[in-house]
Each structure stands twice: as structure tokens, then as C-alpha cells.
Design a protein with these regions (language model features):
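Immediate N-terminus of the mature polypeptide
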Residues: 2-3, 9-15, 21-311
Length: 311
């Protein structure tokens, strides 16, 4: 395909499902941490009995534990103790924002189990337990226990190709100051460009179930900007979702022959997405969701001064 000066490629796409947003993790993956052992009290009535009695949730106690277990001999060496001292433990308010229940609500055992699964999916949590521990006067006391992981991930890499060196430096923290937010800064240099990038992700904006993410990259040949705001289906009972995404970047693309630049052109791209979903919630053991959305993409290719039009 040959494009004339100022050629434009524009596309609209109808989405049938939302796109998951991946996260990043640095979890001492080569270590076998001790799992949380907190059994349910033997004298506590069954979940079915408490639900049938119309029990409500009373006090919610949150216990955030450090990375390593001092009571486990496998996790008591000096390196692990140093990691625990340097690590900023997750704030109880960060964990509370993830709970799918609150004091005063009707007790439902499935919400405790779902909360436990959701906590284990967080990149800054290694293990979690959500257990009813006491029942009296129609109220159930809940204990939420979590165990942190190491979340600071520095990285450096070097390479050489075609007679040119490439380097990359990266620093990522997935639980900034214990708030559950991810911040990433990086600098990379390749044969084509040198880039500096900063990104921030907040999974619970102001303690809500809204998620936001922004990033900015400044390159020697352009820049890139991206932003996301999303209200996901965060539980089986969630009745709606919404997402807005915006992305734009510009760069210079080079074509080589025997290591020499023979042609260049400017590539300007932008993309926007608006999507959402509806659900009746959790009914008779089922959750049904209907998702919809629209995506707009625009690519503009322009020759740089002194070069030919791209083909």
C-alpha cells in the first residue's frame, strides 16, 4: 500500500468484551512462603445456621502481616529480616477498600469467600484469609488476615545489535507507601530512540472500586500519553461496569540497510475506547453480564523532511 503525503488510516471497532488490565509483580517467586494458618473456631455455628438466623456482620478486624513469618525457621535469616524492616506494610485501609462486605450488612458466607479470592489476586498480597471468628447477639465478627510480598522491582539490561548498544533501566513499586498503588519509572535507549517513562496505577481511587492509570513517555523522537478510568465488575453482585481509555503517541520510524538509515517517516497514532456492561447481579448461583463498547483508532503517516513517502 502506498500512501500520499498526509495519508490517514482510520478505523472503528465494536467491542464485545472489556479488556483486562494486567498488572506487574515482584514476589520472591523462588521462595516458598508460609501460608496463613487461621482455622475457623470449632464452636462457631455453621454458615447456613447463621444465615438462616438473619445474622449481620459486626466488627471487622484487619490483620496485615509482613513478608516473612518470624515463627518459621525457614524465614528467619538476616536477609529476610532486613527485607521486613525495609518493606512498608500494606495499610489496613487499603485492604478494607477491597472488601465486598461491611459492618451492618446481612451475613453471607459466599461474600467472604469471594473477598478472599479477590485479595489473593492483588499483586502486593501473597496470601489472605477471611474468617468468621465470633457470633453473639445476631452479629458475626470477621477477621481479615493478609500477608504482604516484596513489591519493589529494580531492573537493568544491556544489549548490542548491529553495532549499536541498547540499555534499559527500570524501577517499579507495586504498593507505594502501603497504599496499593503502582508507580513505575524507566529509561531506555535503542538504535531508534531514547525514552523516559513514568506510569501510575491506582486500583481503588479514593478508597472506591474505581481504577485509574496514567502514563507518559518522552522520547528523543516524540512522546506517548495514555490514561484509563474504569469501574469494573469487581464482584459477582456488581450490576454495572464502565471504562474510558485514551492513548496517543508520535514517533519517527526508521528503515535500515546494512546498518544505515535509508528512509524515515513520522508515525502519529491515537486510540480511544468507551465500553461498559450491565448485569442483574448474583441470582440463583449465576451471574450474567452484557458488555458493549466502541473503539476509535487513527494512524497518520507523514514523510520526514528530505525523505520519500513510505510505501
Amino acid at each position: 500500500m502506498r500512501l500520499s503525503d498526509g495519508g490517514r488510516l482510520i478505523a472503528f471497532t465494536l467491542l464485545s468484551a472489556s479488556i483486562a488490565q494486567p498488572g506487574f509483580a515482584a514476589k520472591f517467586n523462588d521462595l516458598e512462603h508460609t501460608r496463613i494458618d487461621y482455622p475457623r473456631p470449632a464452636d462457631l455455628p455453621s454458615d447456613a445456621a447463621m444465615e438462616a438466623a438473619g445474622a449481620v456482620i459486626g466488627k471487622i478486624d484487619i490483620d496485615v502481616r509482613n513478608i516473612f513469618d518470624e515463627s518459621d525457621q525457614r524465614e528467619t535469616n538476616k536477609l529476610y529480616r532486613l527485607a521486613d524492616r525495609l518493606h512498608i506494610r500494606t495499610k489496613p485501609s487499603t485492604i478494607r477498600a477491597q472488601l465486598l462486605f461491611k459492618s451492618g450488612e446481612k451475613y453471607q458466607a459466599r461474600k467472604l469467600a469471594e473477598t478472599e479470592r479477590a485479595l489473593r489476586l492483588l499483586t502486593f498480597i501473597y496470601d489472605a484469609r477471611v474468617v468468621p471468628v465470633h457470633y453473639a447477639d445476631g452479629k458475626v465478627e470477621i477477621k481479615v488476615i493478609t500477608k504482604d510480598v516484596w513489591t519493589l522491582s529494580p531492573g537493568i539490561s544491556f544489549g548490542r545489535s548491529g553495532g549499536t548498544n541498547s540499555t534499559k533501566f527500570n524501577l517499579e513499586e507495586e504498593n507505594l507507601l502501603g497504599w496499593g498503588k503502582t508507580v513505575q519509572v524507566s529509561r531506555g535507549s535503542t538504535v531508534d530512540r531514547t525514552s523516559n517513562t513514568v506510569a501510575l496505577t491506582d486500583p481503588n481511587v479514593f478508597g472506591s472500586h474505581w481504577t485509574s492509570a496514567v502514563s507518559y513517555s518522552d522520547s528523543s523522537d516524540g512522546s506517548q500519553r495514555a490514561a484509563l478510568i474504569q469501574h469494573p465488575f469487581y464482584s459477582l453482585d456488581t450490576t454495572w461496569s464502565a471504562k474510558i481509555v485514551g492513548l496517543s503517541f508520535d514517533r519517527t520510524v526508521s528503515r535500515y540497510n546494512l546498518g544505515n538509515i535509508v528512509d524515515q517517516f513520522n508515525d502519529n497514532q491515537s486510540a480511544y475506547e468507551l465500553s461498559g456492561g450491565l448485569s442483574n447481579g448474583y441470582i440463583d448461583g449465576w451471574t450474567r453480564r452484557w458488555t458493549f463498547g466502541m473503539r476509535y483508532d487513527r494512524n497518520i503517516f507523514l514523510p520526514t523532511p528530505g525523505t520519500s513517502t513510505p510505501t
